């Protein structure tokens, strides 16, 4: 006759522990993970002459790009007014842009391109450094790039807003912005940010605010100073998961900061936002120079034509750019510049997009 060990005996406790381990180990083996690494090859010098552009790229050898940015060296004299970001976008190969028919334009992009442009002035001090945020996750194994574009801005002191929206059943993990051509010296992207394709956010015209969850779209705003160009284009890019994941395990949180300035001519400003430990990994970020209140009203450009972006990049809490190989940075920084004229009422805006694959906000 066999005897079952009693619950309170050592043998009984051992059997209970063994049973719990049998249940727990498979669960742990299927834990959802997400980690990011910053890749940056360093600066590419230029543009060397007025009304030209320069491109550079960062590549993810062991993951997919979830976002990225750029940082520019501009010098310290009046020539600094001439250098501006022209684009920060995902790429299939580090050399090719997604610029054709809007919609889903690529899958599993692993490269990030950064573009710098010059106005009427150039300097040997100008350079552009790209930053790729490389995502490794056992939940988000594939991504897709959605592109949207619009003609403009084409007349002086105007802007053009365009929004790319993720397909239903996917999650937004990053985005980018681009304007062309570089030969129009005052044309540049002045905003790149996460948003929502819904009425509350005016279908992308109002940016996602601090603490908002699960944005599904990315907006780009092109701005122009005194120049004109009938062929000017503004592009927006959203980097989205594919629809084969269980969204109940995924949540994103937006962190946003807005600071006043730069207001006086030939000056710069920075703003930094970051993900808290409980919000998951920083997977991308955005930046803008604006007329303020971008999370409560439709985006409005700064009053003059000169304000522009000089950077949008992963960083530490003090705004220092993250170095090549940095694992799981927590902060994103926007670097803005007034250009050669005063710009009263300008604001610098920055967004950090935080991804949590352990807990979801959705029922």
Where in this protein do the model-derived segments appear?
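Extracellular attachment/recognition segments
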Residues: 32-363
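Secretory targeting and sorting signals
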Residues: 2-31
């Amino acid at each position: 006759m066999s005897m079952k060990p009693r619950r309170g005996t050592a043998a009984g406790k051992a059997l209970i522990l063994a049973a719990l381990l049998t249940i727990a180990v498979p669960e742990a083996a299927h834990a959802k993970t997400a980690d990011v690494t910053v890749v940056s090859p360093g600066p590419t010098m230029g543009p060397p002459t007025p009304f030209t552009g320069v491109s550079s790229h960062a590549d993810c050898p062991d993951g997919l790009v979830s976002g990225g940015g750029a940082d520019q060296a501009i010098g310290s004299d009046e020539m600094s007014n001439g250098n501006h970001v022209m684009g920060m976008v995902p790429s299939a190969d580090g050399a090719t842009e997604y610029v054709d028919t809007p919609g889903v334009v690529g899958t599993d992009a692993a490269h990030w391109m950064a573009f710098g442009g010059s106005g009427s002035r150039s300097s040997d001090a100008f350079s552009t450094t790209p930053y790729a945020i490389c995502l490794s996750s056992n939940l988000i194994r594939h991504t897709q790039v959605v592109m949207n574009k619009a003609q403009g801005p084409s007349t002086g002191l105007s802007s053009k807003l365009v929004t790319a929206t993720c397909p239903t059943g996917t999650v937004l993990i990053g985005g980018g912005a681009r304007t062309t051509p570089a030969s129009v010296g005052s044309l540049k992207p002045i905003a790149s940010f996460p948003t929502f394709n819904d009425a509350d956010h005016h279908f992308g015209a109002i940016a996602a605010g601090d603490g908002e969850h699960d944005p599904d779209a990315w907006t780009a705003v092109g701005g122009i100073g005194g120049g004109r160009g009938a062929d000017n284009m503004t592009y927006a890019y959203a980097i989205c998961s594919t629809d084969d994941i269980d969204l109940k395990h995924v949540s994103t949180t937006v962190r946003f900061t807005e600071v006043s300035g730069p207001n006086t001519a030939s000056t710069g400003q920075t703003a930094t936002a970051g993900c808290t430990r409980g919000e998951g990994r920083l997977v991308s970020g955005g930046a803008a120079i604006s007329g303020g209140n971008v999370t409560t009203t439709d985006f409005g450009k700064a009053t003059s034509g000169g304000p522009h972006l000089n950077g949008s990049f992963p960083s530490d809490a003090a705004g220092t750019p993250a170095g090549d190989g940095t694992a799981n940075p927590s902060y994103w920084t926007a670097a803005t510049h007034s250009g050669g004229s005063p710009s009263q009422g300008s604001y610098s805006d920055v967004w950090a997009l935080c991804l949590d694959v352990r807990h979801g906000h959705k029922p």
